[in-house]
Design a protein with these regions (language model features):
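Conserved AAA+ ATPase small/helical "lid" subdomain
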Residues: 115-205
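Conserved Walker
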Residues: 17-24, 58-75, 98-107
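Helical mechanochemical/support elements of P-loop NTPase systems and associated helical scaffolds
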Residues: 27, 45, 49, 106-110, ...
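A short helix-turn-beta junction within AAA+ P-loop NTPase domains corresponding to the substrate/partner-engaging
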Residues: 91-125
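Conserved AAA+/SF3 P-loop NTPase catalytic/coupling segment centered on the Walker-B
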Residues: 30-57, 75, 82-93, 109-110
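AAA+/P-loop NTPase substrate/partner-engagement loops
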Residues: 2-46
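Conserved nucleotide-binding/hydrolysis micro-motifs of P-loop NTPases
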Residues: 40-42, 77-87, 97, 121-125, ...
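Conserved P-loop NTPase/AAA+ ATPase motor core
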Residues: 242-316
């Protein structure tokens, strides 16, 4: 009774936000959650919805041209859709937002406002064995519970034990905190939870937001380079980096910060391109350069030239 399902392409500015003729607020002001089904089809009926949705997803407020003025609402937005190819194939050729319509699948301003990407390919598909002939869970009761929980917030729960890494920006920290808060409300409705609970939810929340950011990096390039999301344990000062599982197979370069003295570069012979990993270590001795790991005379000569250049220009 507190959520609404919108079929693909049926959302209009009047039905979702506000009707300028009557001044009546739309679905975002009437429901707790709005789910756009088959969102990989045409998502909205008219173009005006996209900028309105951007404002709403950013601040919870919106304003249509006309007499309605600025209005606020609290409905959550859910985009439900399918990826019709293996995830590995999609990630090799494009990005996970590519199934969206052309109006939004490369609109980084819109996509950056998505706080959470749930990997549907990891979720078990229903089978007859998942259903029972006995008493089931009452969805009416569950919806009332969810509605009642909206008045509580645990967005500051992580601050007791953890801090977020420096690569999480404002648009990253907000959804991460909200996800942790939501999981606490679902799994600890009495408000009692431990550090271990929060850490588990924090890892999951960071992964879901990082999945969004990784796609933005594929679309928008260097603007979204900072995807090494992490959190720091306040007690031990240990920093933990949270990866995105499906990205491991597509990244030749590890997705955690490189250790000092390590870097990657690329070289080409005119026809082919090779990725090179360079590791520099210092050892006790007389300061002589020792090159290992390659038999290429050209590469060794390039390394010696670089080494000699650095020595000649180093500041003492």
């Amino acid at each position: 009774p507190y959520s609404m399902l919108v079929s693909g392409g049926q959302g209009t500015a009047a039905s979702l936000f506000v009707n300028n003729s009557s001044g009546q607020i739309g679905a975002v002001g009437k429901w707790d959650a709005i789910c756009f089904d088959e969102s990989t089809d045409e998502l909205f009926k008219d173009k005006e919805v996209v900028p309105l949705m951007k404002d709403y997803m950013e601040s919870g407020s919106f304003s249509r041209a006309g007499k309605s003025g600025e209005k606020s609402a609290n409905a959550s937005i859910i985009l439900n859709g399918n990826i019709n190819q293996p995830v590995e194939t999609v990630l090799q050729t494009s990005h996970l937002f590519s199934p969206f319509s052309d109006k939004i699948n490369s609109d980084t301003a819109f996509l950056d406002r998505i706080g959470f990407f749930l990997p549907g390919w990891e979720i078990m598909k229903f089978a007859p064995s998942n259903f029972t002939n006995h008493f089931g869970f009452s969805t009416d009761y569950f919806s009332e519970f969810l509605h009642a929980q909206r008045k509580y917030s645990y967005v500051d729960a992580i601050d007791k034990w953890f801090t977020l890494g420096n690569q999480l920006r404002q648009r990253d920290t907000k959804p991460v905190r909200k996800t942790v808060s939501g999981l606490i409300k679902l799994l600890h409705p009495d408000g009692n939870f431990t550090k271990e609970d929060v850490e588990q939810y924090l890892k999951w929340a960071i992964e879901m937001r990082r999945r969004v950011k990784e796609q933005l990096k594929r679309i928008g390039g260097m603007e979204f380079w900072d995807t090494n999301f992490s959190y720091i344990d306040k007690e031990t000062q240990e920093e933990t980096f949270v990866p995105v599982p499906e990205e491991r197979g597509t990244n030749l370069i590890e997705d955690t910060p490189l250790s000092p003295g390590t870097c990657y570069t690329a070289t080409s012979d005119g026809d082919k391109v090779s990725l090179i990993k360079i590791e520099v270590v210092t050892m006790a001795g007389n300061g002589k350069l020792n090159i290992s790991g390659t038999s290429s005379a050209v590469m060794k000569e390039d390394i010696r030239n670089t080494y000699n250049y650095i020595r000649a220009n180093e500041k003492t």
